From Swiss-Prot:
Native source organism of the sequence: Brucella canis (strain ATCC 23365 / NCTC 10854 / RM-666)
EC number assigned by the record: 2.7.7.23, 2.3.1.157
Keywords attached to this entry: Acyltransferase, Cell shape, Cell wall biogenesis/degradation, Cytoplasm, Magnesium, Metal-binding, Multifunctional enzyme, Nucleotidyltransferase, Peptidoglycan synthesis, Repeat, Transferase
Binding residues annotated for UDP-N-acetyl-alpha-D-glucosamine, in chain numbering: 11-14, 25, 78, 83-84, 144, 158, 173, 230, 319, 337, 352, 363
Function: Catalyzes the last two sequential reactions in the de novo biosynthetic pathway for UDP-N-acetylglucosamine (UDP-GlcNAc). The C-terminal domain catalyzes the transfer of acetyl group from acetyl coenzyme A to glucosamine-1-phosphate (GlcN-1-P) to produce N-acetylglucosamine-1-phosphate (GlcNAc-1-P), which is converted into UDP-GlcNAc by the transfer of uridine 5-monophosphate (from uridine 5-triphosphate), a reaction catalyzed by the N-terminal domain.
Domain of life per record: Bacteria
Quaternary organization: Homotrimer.
Chain segments carrying region Linker: 233-253
Lineage: Bacteria, Pseudomonadati, Pseudomonadota, Alphaproteobacteria, Hyphomicrobiales
Catalytic reaction annotation: alpha-D-glucosamine 1-phosphate + acetyl-CoA = N-acetyl-alpha-D-glucosamine 1-phosphate + CoA + H(+); N-acetyl-alpha-D-glucosamine 1-phosphate + UTP + H(+) = UDP-N-acetyl-alpha-D-glucosamine + diphosphate
Ranges where the record places region N-acetyltransferase: 254-454
Pathway noted in the entry: Nucleotide-sugar biosynthesis; UDP-N-acetyl-alpha-D-glucosamine biosynthesis; N-acetyl-alpha-D-glucosamine 1-phosphate from alpha-D-glucosamine 6-phosphate (route II): step 2/2; Nucleotide-sugar biosynthesis; UDP-N-acetyl-alpha-D-glucosamine biosynthesis; UDP-N-acetyl-alpha-D-glucosamine from N-acetyl-alpha-D-glucosamine 1-phosphate: step 1/1; Bacterial outer membrane biogenesis; LPS lipid A biosynthesis
Protein name: Bifunctional protein GlmU
Amino acid sequence: MTDRTCLSIVLAAGEGTRMKSNLPKVLHRVAGLPLVCHVVNAVRGTGKSDVALVVGRGAEDVRSAVEKIAGPVSAFEQKERLGTAHAVLAAREAIARGYDDLLIVFGDTPLIEAQSLLAARERLAQGADLVVIGFRPASPHGYGRLIEEGGQLVAIIEEKEATDEQKKIGFCNGGLMALRGQHALALLDAVGNDNAKGEYYLTDIVAIAHGKGLNVTAIEVPVDNVIGINNRAELAEAETIWQNRKRRELMLSGVTLIAPETVFFSYDTVIEPDVVIEPNVFFGPSVHVASGALIHSFSHLEGAQVGEKAEIGPFARLRPGADLAEKSKVGNFCEVKNAKVGKGAKINHLTYIGDAVIGASSNIGAGTITCNYDGYNKFKTIIGDNAFIGSNSSLVAPVEIGDNAYIASGSVITADVPADALALGRARQETKEGRAKILREKYAAIKAAKSVSK
């Protein structure tokens, strides 16, 4: 982290036509979070930084998405598409406020890491005036080359303009930059548009800064940090890279993933050490799994809190508001939504628990349903400690079942049940001996008569 003031300009005005989508490109998601929000999280990870969004199509939606994670930000519309330097200058008002550092990043590079941006800012703190983030791809073909002389970056040369000798250079332009705030407007205003497209290219400020005798340098970051997203195939590739990073991070922190490539996490998933996750598990946003928990295969968790040594699945679904205490269990083909499950409570199979509180050590039998919705409103079911809910019971909310109560299997419970009570809510069984034989003979005769008449 650094204490220097910083303005991060996030370029998010691209049309994204290759995405073939009505959704602005930067709002497509990796690990459940919009691309642009990944970028904003990275710049915030470098220390104190104000954010200026340069937006185009879907401006309000883009701004709203960013403000959900970062609070109020400035947004500036790029009304004409006249190049990257022109896009940066759309935020002239913010730049003019005066900052120690200026970060220029792209809203479609979700894999940029805070440590890479921090390295660029640290170079500014050490005396650099302009820092370009570069990378070394397996093949540099098609990328702009970073031209260095005597430890200084002197120019960025595009592939089509490079000499044969320059094309041999493997150090390429990643597009992201950091520059000293006091020079920002002078450098940007000096960029011209004397080129075939008549556009203002941000890359030109390198040669301009070098010509002014400023300290211009480049740093190298991993290739995946500067991957831009232009189509759905690249979006999927970015998802794969992000997931692999997260899987490795968790395994190195003490989480067991039996088949890592089959487990998918969200941007904010928290898994504590000594959790074991079996194959084919999906984590949606806002999930926290405490130490020692076991997540069986084919489980889906979203907005859930899982306590220490709890057990989930297989084939379990935890929806937002599911809060499972220590050593509780939600087994196969169970769904839990907006419910607190007490310590040691068991919901073993084929059950729906919604808008409920289940006490410690209670047992919920197979096929139990909390009937929480009347078509208009949701109602709550409260089950005390050590209660036993027999299989195939329907608990019609609002209803409260006391501690140590016993609900007989197959019951429909519509009224509160006191502590230590036994409740039966079903018709009494009648057994008519010999009636089955009579019915079989009757139905056989009817069937035979139909066959003769054909």
